[in-house]
Each structure stands twice: as C-alpha cells, then as structure tokens.
A protein has these predicted regions:
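Active-site acidic/histidine proton-transfer and metal-coordination neighborhood
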Residues: 1, 11-118
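A broad structural signal for short, well-ordered beta-strand segments within beta-sheet-rich domains
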Residues: 1-2, 143
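Short, charge-rich amphipathic segments
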Residues: 4-17, 63-74, 120-129, 150-169
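Active-site beta-loop-alpha junctions enriched in small/polar residues
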Residues: 6-11, 45-47, 96-98, 123-125, ...
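Histidine-acidic metal/acid-base catalytic patches
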Residues: 29, 78, 82-85, 104-108, ...
Length: 235
C-alpha cells in the first residue's frame, strides 16, 4: 500500500507554479491509480543557496524568505492544498533541510499561513534546529504523518564547518541507522504514544551509496533498522 509520496513545489516562486502544480497533478494521478489514502507530501523546492548550506537555516535567518517571499509562499501552498483536496487527498507538509522550511520559526510560519498538516521527520527536524520531541508537543494537533530517521550531529558540524552542500552531507553519512545517531528515538516514540498519534510511520535512512558499495548493503541496513524498531518501539 502506498502511504505517501514526495511532491516538491517552489511555493515562493510564482513563475514556477504552473510547471510544479502540473507535476503535482501528474503525481496525484499515480496516487489515484494506486488506490488507498496516500498523503501528498509537500516539500518546498528550496534554492541553490539553501542547498549549499544544509542545517544553517536554524542559525542564520538571512538565508530565509523575506515578507514578500512568504506572501508568495502562502499563495502557492494554498493552490497546492486546493489541488490535492479537490482530488480527494489530504496533504502534509515536510519541513526539510536545504529548503525554505527547515528551522523551527519557518515551520511555525507555514502552520500560521495555512491549514496543511505537518509531517514530523525526526532527522530533518534535528538538523534544522528543532527538538523532535518538543515538536510533537508544540505541533501535535497538526501532525498527520511521521518519518523516523537518525542523524549524526558530528557529521552536521563538519558539514557546516567545511561549508559543504546537501549532497556532500548525504555522502558523509549524516543520516545513519536507527539508534546509532543523536536523535532521542526512545523518547520520541514515548511522546508519539502520549499524543495519541495513530497514523503512518515511515522509516527512512537517506544515503548515497559509494561506487564500491553494493545495493545489498542498504537492504541489510534496513533489516537492522527493523530489528531496532522491534526491540525499542515494539513495532
């Protein structure tokens, strides 16, 4: 069963709305063909500057949108929401590193400007400067999808120090196997139960394989992640 799918839109750039919303419409065709109640996962298209500065949105507000940019963002997001709902799908918004919605105040702004639900991604939230557990407490009423990831903050510090970009962050292994990084996943699952969440949980480990690394290594990593979930989260 399809639980969701990534639908990037350059919300703050009206010149790209026609192209991006047409692509969203084609993606919704695939959702409809698959059946079920998959969630369109809206993500901001970001910019070259944000992609060159992963994790910096939480500490440098100059990388963010100005007021005109936020007005365009709100209008673009409204159009995407209407398109999804007109086709029978309830969307969610994914705060994601290297986009214009990464830091806690950027997430607050999206929730203030729209009625869209929120996807809580433990990895991207931590990279952007949010506490995933506090995110559930602050935004729990809007959460309608969850991504479980773990993150190595030592890798993030190196990426920021070296002014490395998003692809380099992935290649360095910023996202790691569950239980081997710095996300308090045990505490997160405890809070997830406390807020009564009963929706989809998607387990992810974003990575870029080396040329000499077989695809089977990714499969083995997911088996280890599955074992961690059974032991620590009872899933």
């Amino acid at each position: 069963m399809l639980s969701g799918g990534w639908c990037p839109v350059r919300f703050s750039e009206p010149a790209h709305w026609e192209e991006d919303l047409a692509e969203l419409d084609r993606t919704l065709d695939l959702f409809a063909a698959a059946g079920g109640t998959a969630r369109p996962v809206f993500g901001d298209g970001g910019s070259d500057e944000r992609r060159a500065n992963p994790g910096r949105g939480g500490e440098d507000r100059s990388l963010g949108l100005d007021e005109a940019g936020w007005r365009h963002f709100a209008d673009g997001l409204r159009r995407a929401e209407e398109l999804a709902r007109d086709r029978g799908f309830e969307p969610t918004f994914h705060a994601h590193t290297s986009t214009f919605v990464e830091a806690p105040w950027e997430i607050d702004r999206v929730l203030e400007l729209s009625g869209v639900g929120l996807l809580v991604d433990t990895g991207h939230l931590l990279i952007g400067g949010s506490d995933p557990i506090q995110a559930l407490r602050d935004w729990g009423s809007r959460v309608n999808y969850v991504h479980i990831k773990d993150v190595r903050l030592d890798v993030l510090r190196g990426v920021v120090r070296d002014h490395a970009g998003a692809i380099e962050a992935w290649q360095r292994g910023i996202f790691c196997e569950l239980g081997t990084g710095d996300v308090d996943l045990d505490g997160f699952f405890h809070e997830l139960r406390a807020v009564g969440y009963d929706g989809w949980i998607c387990v992810e480990q974003d990575r870029i394989l080396r040329d000499d690394e077989p695809i089977s290594e990714s499969a083995e990593a997911q088996r280890r992640n599955r074992a961690w979930l059974r032991e620590h989260a009872g899933l």
